[in-house]
Amino acid sequence: RMAEVTGELEELAKSNPGKNSIALFGSGTEYHRNEKNGGAAEKENAAVYTWDEFIEKVHGEKIKFLMEHMLLDGINGNSKRNDRISAGKSLLYKLMNLLQGAAGDRMDLARFAYTLARLKPKEKELQPCYEKVRSQFYQWAVKEEERKELVTALQFIIYRMRDKEEA
């Protein structure tokens, strides 16, 4: 089954315009073969990016922002910098699930705002960082493509956190 999944993901990447693409999967990815379309793989919420999009938008923008503004257990949680807000894996999962549950440009903004508010630090000196994170997450959440990139970035961060915990 794994070889089949890998083959289907490869087809998704190749079907992206320009073919210089990467197809990733996680809990939000759905893919299937469309027999009416000659058996070609089709994507539904799949994380398919050109390499440039992935490097610039997912890694260079979203992951970089998360690493610079959040203390992430098992990744940078032991950092000497004290200007980041702490974010546990559980909270990141909740944010990711809310983002994945959004359809098109619609999402449950009230729940999303509540979950983001749980990041709010007690320390006054961390308020500017929290405001940046809250504002940036909201900007990304309301645009479908940006939201998809943020979900992918969160998946990478969560997987890295999981790897560090299990090591």
Language-model segment annotations:
Residues R1-A167:
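Charged, helix-rich terminal subdomains or tails
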